[in-house]
Swiss-Prot record:
Keywords: Cell outer membrane, Disulfide bond, Fimbrium biogenesis, Membrane, Signal, Transmembrane, Transmembrane beta strand, Transport. Residues 1-45 form the signal peptide. It comes from Escherichia coli (strain K12). This is Outer membrane usher protein FimD. InterPro entries: Fimb_usher, Fimbrial_membr_usher_CS, FimD_plug_dom, PapC-like_C, PapC-like_C_sf, PapC_N, PapC_N_sf. GO terms for biological process: pilus assembly. Pfam families: PapC_C, PapC_N, Usher. It comes from the Bacteria. It is a multi-pass membrane protein. GO terms for cellular component: cell outer membrane. Belongs to the fimbrial export usher family. The keyword Disulfide bond applies. Involved in the export and assembly of FimA fimbrial subunits across the outer membrane.
Amino acid sequence: MSYLNLRLYQRNTQCLHIRKHRLAGFFVRLVVACAFAAQAPLSSADLYFNPRFLADDPQAVADLSRFENGQELPPGTYRVDIYLNNGYMATRDVTFNTGDSEQGIVPCLTRAQLASMGLNTASVAGMNLLADDACVPLTTMVQDATAHLDVGQQRLNLTIPQAFMSNRARGYIPPELWDPGINAGLLNYNFSGNSVQNRIGGNSHYAYLNLQSGLNIGAWRLRDNTTWSYNSSDRSSGSKNKWQHINTWLERDIIPLRSRLTLGDGYTQGDIFDGINFRGAQLASDDNMLPDSQRGFAPVIHGIARGTAQVTIKQNGYDIYNSTVPPGPFTINDIYAAGNSGDLQVTIKEADGSTQIFTVPYSSVPLLQREGHTRYSITAGEYRSGNAQQEKTRFFQSTLLHGLPAGWTIYGGTQLADRYRAFNFGIGKNMGALGALSVDMTQANSTLPDDSQHDGQSVRFLYNKSLNESGTNIQLVGYRYSTSGYFNFADTTYSRMNGYNIETQDGVIQVKPKFTDYYNLAYNKRGKLQLTVTQQLGRTSTLYLSGSHQTYWGTSNVDEQFQAGLNTAFEDINWTLSYSLTKNAWQKGRDQMLALNVNIPFSHWLRSDSKSQWRHASASYSMSHDLNGRMTNLAGVYGTLLEDNNLSYSVQTGYAGGGDGNSGSTGYATLNYRGGYGNANIGYSHSDDIKQLYYGVSGGVLAHANGVTLGQPLNDTVVLVKAPGAKDAKVENQTGVRTDWRGYAVLPYATEYRENRVALDTNTLADNVDLDNAVANVVPTRGAIVRAEFKARVGIKLLMTLTHNNKPLPFGAMVTSESSQSSGIVADNGQVYLSGMPLAGKVQVKWGEEENAHCVANYQLPPESQQQLLTQLSAECR
């Protein structure tokens, strides 16, 4: 244990408080404080520690002269968190040297290190004349600069006047501190399945597996996404077993350009042109590298299920999401999209086989850029789609957006292919109190599969406005109008004008196109209006509205989607009223759903200091009505269990009836577990005619230089916790995440290019484990697997009473273990606390600079000491 870490534990403990690994030399701080107080009137003179304040015999006190210079620590190298002007900079080993009588010890920081933290070295006279590896005398060279080491927090606080700092944005973290992570392989798996027993329609089985694998080498990230699906039913002979490869790509960041290079399968940004999947190469700006103060969307999907239903989401022809949801309103906000744009097709398949299908627009908000900021993308490759009727057309695309003074932004782009050419130009304006508006036009020349040539234009308006005084947030109002000759690039990749086929005894024949086709180039898009608004009502209520209206050339049929909801709370009682409407151009009639949800936590009836497990439970009621006469009512209870609240449950029962379906009782029960090695869920639902069992497991596997670590599903950027010896330690602020039997864990997500705090809960450490530092800070790059290391000392906690020449060792003497690197300070009566000690060994003691001011003590402990919380021992130091 380093001296610095010992002082940390001294500051956070009381006397002989031994709850969780900390016995402190509390008397050191107490008596030293008294010494300071006694000398306060002599503030104009040098501080002096009179040993007689500590003991009558001056020989019973170690040499404390270093405290006279304000040194809580001797000179040396210590790992500290560096903060500059209250902003975190880095965690690193810093060498501290002896300063003058007022400074105590001072940090040794080089010119390059200070420059990386934002110091404008050219503005400091004489600094650029120093050698590259020289220690900069910061407090003397920079006027009004300070450097203070907070021993208890292991934190080096630097302050430098703004006049000497480079002009950097708030929240700026120097790229030198970005961590590309370790070399490692990863695998994400998500398996789900269900079995349905239908008294009328027979039995059916469905399974789905999503595998996301990857390899990190240096700054390069290799990723692959593959899915497998299986279904069988009594209605059809045999079963369908299908593997589908989604994409594979290699990428890395280009830090000087604040950009990202992608090779392989990727997607274009949907800010100017419609987003498309490609196979090729792309170099594009990555605004995540900018600080939050310089940064300007996957959509949240709302829906309502009549019963326990399977929700599938497609984007650009690929299945990107699959889940089973209970009856009533649901929200999906964790989509792993195959691209950053492209409308999402949501299918809700009920247990009786009926389906709802609607489209969620996926596009960006107005394209304003900060003054002087440029965002670009350059893409070359071939078009990719999950639709076999689309060809792999080669293309080139470039886009550029640039911020001008006075809130103006200009932008544009081009798409070029053999049968398609498009050019876009637009302008945006921040209109202050009136909101933000952008307008652009695209001119396109297209050749369709029938070799017909078309010229057309498409004009788009986007508007965004927040009315803070009224609580209204108009998140997006968009309108696009296209002439009859306008087609987008994807339209020209089809091999035929329409793709509707039916299977007959004579084989495949071409029939008259209908709107059951997913595409028909005879009916190209005309006008589209979309709106998203949220309104705050008072302090506890929110109203949201979202919808879209799409018209086509050549037909009066339209696509319509509308959703509305009211969320409110009365004390701790929450209720939600929601409505949805979906009408597809190819579908007769429309789907509508009205739902009400009420949730009352059991804590509403419990005392605030109740320890009952029911304080984590709630009662619920839900009602849904499809406005065609069918209604479902459910009541039940849901909540969490276990110490970490990582087992959630829900039990609902009720009645469904009316409309076209049968009437009778209905209900469901689910269990969801989030553990250190992955997640699992199981559920069961029933009605009079249908019974359904659904289940799933998901998790992540990380293969690294120190072995294989299992965890919860991994996001793009993750943290590997390395604390060998600290098994089963909980990671703070994470549900179900604990270190494994070796002391490793995976924090399944982290924010790239931002400071991430990783901490272990010391209350969950074993009794024979101590941590030098329970907190680590990391700044990962995108896609990185960064390591947060914690040094765990495993061994016996020992309260040793040391004597020398039949007298207690001097107060304040330094004690160091030769084998465990543990150290401590002698308190009263020769007592010292040491942790992580072996059964047998020796300790070295030093209490001055004289030749006879040191000794060595050997000790031997009985085996049962390994099971004791604290072992006490007396030894003679010779």
